[in-house]
Amino acid sequence: VARGYYAEADVEELHRYMNGLLKPLGAEIDAFYYCPHHPEHGIGKYKAVCRCRKPETGMFEMAEQEFEVDKAASWMIGDKLIDVEAGRNYGVRSILVGTGYGSQIFDKLKKEEKSGREEEPYDFYAEDLMGAARYILEQGRDHRGRE
């Protein structure tokens, strides 16, 4: 949006399309959050420094205004380090997925690990979104010991 490739209406249409695909499967995304801004390359009103651009936590804070968020039971899933960094900044666990940029980042981090990096910047790596979902379900819905 910030660079002018898509309008906000296009993003909203994509969100409706995604929920349309999920609905027959019995799933629905309750709310979508995105940052339309870019601090350097934004056009017009979209050229802005903001709290909603990852790795800041503004989008998480927007969700807190709408929903009761249990950080202990919440996850951030993304294909870039900035995604998992945003999750860490907010205080939730994170999963790097291998789709999109994720597999390249994972391979690069594995090479760095061999050269002395101490810890992963994410809590789990999954090949794809389905793998991430399975992992989260394996952990249990309530991370305080209840199913």
Predicted regions and their residues:
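Conserved strand-turn element in the central/C-terminal portion of the radical SAM core barrel
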Residues: V1-Y6
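Asp-based, Mg2+/Mn2+-dependent phosphohydrolase catalytic module
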Residues: E8-A31, E40-M76, K80-E147
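Short loop/turn motifs enriched for small/polar and acidic residues
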Residues: C35-H37
